[in-house]
């Protein structure tokens, strides 16, 4: 029989071809939200680092629904977002060929973790990046030139973006090289945008100045890499019958004799994962504050709610697996996001006008789970664990050694 008995849709989408390793590790923003001059000046994106997942309990606020006023348990992802540092301003002009850079101005002082991004091997380099450039800010001729640049940007540019980098020293990661990106400034006139950006040169921008509670955002990143995979795993094609000669996790017919080539649309083995992806409509459940010192005391209770008053941080017992402790500001997103732990993620304001009731729903968290994510966690805090377990042998030994 030369034809199949039943028709079936093809396996796997051709919309994501070529399925190869991403050329960039950090998610690229290919389009920023549309500018609206009537709104106040604001940033449209931010960088964060995926820490891990937990679950929450909340009450649904959806009048008319069967689940209204009922408690639901939902999975959430914690993305650590330490403040970003603004180190430059870029002006763009609109041309018939699209946007073109007009002027770029960098700050006088740039940290080493940012400079590392401009070198392949920081250890062997002379570390001279920006040493000549920063002198512009110190002599009169340089200052005049910078002022001239800012004025010409106000006159000719239509789009203003800032150059900002992350602060790796605040994170529990080994990497020292900061991630650097351009973030579009929206709202107000071009002059207002430029003044706003100028005021914030060398300043830190926290995440709560970019996003708000209950906002819908987009997450751009590179997925978890899986390596070289067979056709069944990569394209989810059907396994052949058990008695098939020469393997069954294959495609039986890869095309006609002529044309004597294999079409691009035929499922083949190859790279799976580590692809650049944009996921839209991730709801922010909480924008949490990092650890802070108040009246000489370290305040950690950023996972307490109105219903759960226990003094606990967002970190599960033992920290997030394969990440560590989240000590900075963080964002809690509904559901999962792309990438492995420690992966840098680009968080962008939504391109769409959100009108759905689910998108506009107010989120009121009742409980955030902080049990250990390594094994079957039972305790929310160390105090709860100590109260249940009682005095342990290791505590007694430590006491004796101390005495």
Curated annotation (Swiss-Prot):
GO terms for biological process: cellular response to interleukin-4; cytoplasmic translation. The keyword Ribonucleoprotein applies. SUPFAM superfamilies: Translation proteins. GO terms for cellular component: cytoplasm; cytosol; cytosolic large ribosomal subunit; nucleolus. Residues 18-31 have a biased composition (Basic residues). The modification Phosphoserine is found at residues 13, 304. Pfam families: Ribosomal_L3. The modification Tele-methylhistidine is found at residue 245. Constitutively monomethylated at His-245 by METTL18. Methylation at His-245 regulates translation elongation by slowing ribosome traversal on tyrosine codons: slower elongation provides enough time for proper folding of synthesized proteins and prevents cellular aggregation of tyrosine-rich proteins. It is not required for incorporation of RPL3 into ribosomes. The modification N6-acetyllysine is found at residues 136, 286, 294, 366, 373. There is a cross-link at residue 294 (Glycyl lysine isopeptide (Lys-Gly) (interchain with G-Cter in SUMO1)). Residues 1-36 are annotated as: Disordered. There is a cross-link at residues 39, 224, 226, 286, 366, 386, 393, 399 (Glycyl lysine isopeptide (Lys-Gly) (interchain with G-Cter in SUMO2)). Component of the large ribosomal subunit. Interacts with DHX33. Belongs to the universal ribosomal protein uL3 family. This is Large ribosomal subunit protein uL3. It comes from Mus musculus (Mouse). The gene is Rpl3.
